[in-house]
Design a protein with these regions (language model features):
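Conserved active-site alpha-helix within GNAT-family acetyltransferase domains
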Residues: 108, 133-155
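Conserved beta-strand in the GNAT
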Residues: 66, 73-83, 89-91, 96
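A short, internal acetyl-CoA/4′-phosphopantetheine-binding micro-motif in the GNAT/acyltransferase core
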Residues: 94-102, 131-132
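Short amphipathic alpha-helix that is part of the acyltransferase structural core
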Residues: 10-48
Length: 188
């Protein structure tokens, strides 16, 4: 996020500010290992290969974000991409906060900051994510995100449990959030 975007985000009441001591930033390839570790240690996310997190930091940096701590190390991350058939939709793939930094509002600040950047720079109008019914933290995070931005949420099962090859995988419920209004002064 540039200084101008941070000023814009700070002026909007619907943007949760990044907690003191942290900085919102675009991920770099060098962050891939730390992001993989945060995802692994979350115990809630489906862990991808370490290689995929390196690729994510290279190929999807514009639609992802990290919160850096005082030592510039990633303390939290959110990964996303634009849907190929709906390029005005940001799909949030994963979001997690390192255990040492939980309870400070980093996930909400990352989600707000990334969405504000994607609306301004990429013309995003809606956000999608999938969440399993048993993931209370993510369900609360995205419900409060929609409420903070005064946008509707539509929920429907995207992938039923029977589609997954492993036993015991919960269904993935699609959360369609938006539409968001393009803020005044944005590039779109």
């Amino acid at each position: 996020m540039t200084a101008a975007q941070a000023d814009h985000a700070g002026a909007r009441s619907d943007i949760k500010e990044i907690p003191e001591g942290f900085k919102l930033d675009t991920p770099r390839v060098e962050d891939g290992a730390a992001i993989w570790r945060i995802a692994r240690d979350s115990k809630a996310l489906d862990l991808n290969s370490s290689y995929s997190y390196l690729l994510w930091c290279r190929d999807f940096a514009a639609t992802s974000a990290v919160a850096r701590d005082a030592t510039s190390e990633p303390a939290a991350f959110v990964t996303g991409y634009l849907r190929p058939d709906r390029p005005d939709t940001l799909v949030v793939w994963q979001i997690a906060v390192d255990a040492a930094h939980r309870g400070r509002g980093l996930a909400a600040a990352l989600l707000d900051g990334l969405t504000a950047r994607a609306i301004d720079e990429l013309g995003v109008r809606s956000v999608e994510t999938t969440i399993t019914p048993d993931n209370d933290a993510s369900n609360r995070l995205f419900a409060s995100f929609a409420a903070r931005h005064s946008v509707p949420v539509k929920r429907e099962v995207l992938f039923d449990a029977a589609l997954f090859p492993e036993q015991g995988h919960e269904p993935e419920v699609l959360h369609l959030i938006g539409p968001f209004e393009t803020p005044p002064g944005s590039n779109r």
